[in-house]
Amino acid sequence: MSLPSPWRADFPAFSAFAAEGLTYLDSAATAQKPQAVLDALNGYYLGGAANVHRAQHVPGERATRAFEAARSRVAHWLHAGNPAEVLFTRGTTEAINLVAYGLERHFRPGDELLVSALEHHANLLPWQQLALRRGLVLRVLPLDERGVIDLEQARHIIGERTRLLAISQLSNVLGTWQPVVELIQLARERGAWTLVDGAQGSVHGRHDLPGLGCDFYAFSGHKLYGPDGIGVLWGRPQALEQLAHWQFGGEMVRHTGFHEASFHAAPLGFEAGTPAVSAAIGLGATIDWLATLDEAEVAAHEGALHARLLAGLLARDGVSLLGEPQAALASFCVDGVHVADLAHLLGEQGIAVRAGHHCAMPLLQRLEVPGALRVSLGLYNDADDLERFFLALDRSLELLR
């Protein structure tokens, strides 16, 4: 079965890749962009760029309408109740830092912050550093042998001192879906805030906020086939009201003198300075493009490709998967082979994958591996991409063994 992607033609980058002999299998790091997004970016600049929320002229009003329309599209896509619940950020990393700084005043020494053992540095370091600043306790939820947060152990760890739970929806290293709904329920029973890192999960169909029940949800545009430099923090209205302002400057201020100021509520109060106007408009176009797709068809295509990827890896001697991948990607090691050497040889054959710790050093330390090679899929990949990857992998292993 050839498993062609019916959406590949929407992505101009693949024409360029074909001309260069490249096979792109690194979508968990960043995704390629469909023509609809490129058209939106180009159209904004060709029509005249302007700042938003601060001009009475036609270009400014036009830019503001497009910017806020993008916010509304994101809110609708997330099934959020109100566009005002959507804050634009530079990405998932900034969104999580915003929450960490915004909630800091509410914590007292000895309060507990909970993350899991698989977190990306973006959902670890903000809480680690907050704990160090405020004398808090950072606790780590362990994983089971599959690479899934152990719910039974979590029930014993989430307790009276738990004030915040921050977890990833889909591991960027293990490719495992996490039991976020159950964990959120446990945390809410203790009155703790909950944040979900949706950088990977949002890309693969799980972006229904009412179904999650979290207080905050963060994701990045560039992994979702959208522009770089734009991300989203969604917040429950009651949770957003608890955030202190953390960046200060133009347009987030309601009134200021030399010695005091008052600030806007969300979202504008958390979007200081000139926002990424074009990127936000491009993200709106991304959401529009995604809305034209049949999610079940996309899921079936990605699932079939992922199954073929796993089968091919497991069929090769010496290959060990990290965890039990369920979606989108697979990370692996090869006995007696350094992943950097393997990635180099694959790159020389035009195969774009990633090697290293994948911004999850503590996870790889717990797994007792110095690094791993990751293959990650997008909806534009097809079986031919995997065939080229496996051919290059076999050639590389012949040289390295």
UniProtKB/Swiss-Prot annotation:
The family line of this record is: Belongs to the class-V pyridoxal-phosphate-dependent aminotransferase family. Csd subfamily.
Question: Could you state a single Gene Ontology molecular function term?
Answer: pyridoxal phosphate binding
Gene name tied to this protein: csd
PANTHER family xrefs: CYSTEINE DESULFURASE (PTHR43586), CYSTEINE DESULFURASE 1, CHLOROPLASTIC (PTHR43586:SF8)
InterPro entries attached to this UniProt entry:
Aminotrans_V_dom (IPR000192), Aminotrans_V_PyrdxlP_BS (IPR020578), Cys_dSase_SufS (IPR010970), PyrdxlP-dep_Trfase (IPR015424), PyrdxlP-dep_Trfase_major (IPR015421), PyrdxlP-dep_Trfase_small (IPR015422)
Any GO BP: cysteine metabolic process
Required co-factor(s) are: pyridoxal 5'-phosphate
Which EC number(s) does the record attach to this protein? 2.8.1.7
The identity of this protein, by name, is Probable cysteine desulfurase
Q: Which domain of life is it from?
A: Bacteria
> Function, please?
Catalyzes the removal of elemental sulfur and selenium atoms from L-cysteine, L-cystine, L-selenocysteine, and L-selenocystine to produce L-alanine.
**What does the UniProt keyword field contain?**
Pyridoxal phosphate, Transferase
Positions carrying N6-(pyridoxal phosphate)lysine: 223
Q: Which Pfam families match?
A: Aminotran_5
Among Gene3D superfamilies, the record links this protein to:
Aspartate Aminotransferase, domain 1, Type I PLP-dependent aspartate aminotransferase-like (Major domain)
Name the reaction it catalyses.
(sulfur carrier)-H + L-cysteine = (sulfur carrier)-SH + L-alanine
